[in-house]
Amino acid sequence: MYKRQALRAYWRPEDSGTAMPEISVGCDSISFDNHPLNVSEGSGYFVGLGWQDMIQADDRIGIALGQPVKATQVSTGTLSEVEPFLWEAYYSFKPNDSITVTPAVWGGTDVESSTDQDVFGAMLTTVFKF
């Protein structure tokens, strides 16, 4: 059995194409009863910034940073001191009215609560509308 709470908020400027970004924030908290790994509480957070119409109309640039939900309290044993961290950056643009292209890079340090678990990746998403 567990209880989970999440809080999300965002703000968007009235005018796009400005240096002022859209801002998204969030935090999560979870508590467990009788978790098989003896975790009794965990928490995580994220912050995202996005800019619209900065280079051309209908494009988006964004970054996101955060910590995935990690154990903050254990019922027995030792709590890990490792602080995992994740990030992402992307640029989305429309070469024409029916295609959207979004290249992105992402990574993380100390994923899975281990100092040896760093990750890095890139992807390209293309959306076609007919």
Annotate the PLM regions.
Residues 3-5, 39-45, 81-87, 118-122:
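Residues that define the transmembrane beta-barrel architecture of outer-membrane proteins
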Residues 30-42, 72-80, 112-119:
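Outer-membrane beta-barrel translocator domains and adjoining extracellular loop/strand segments
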Residues 27-33, 53, 65-71, 107-111, ...:
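Transmembrane beta-strands of outer-membrane beta-barrel pores
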Residues 5-7, 14-23, 54-61, 95-103:
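Repeated loop/turn-to-beta-strand initiation elements of outer-membrane beta-barrel proteins
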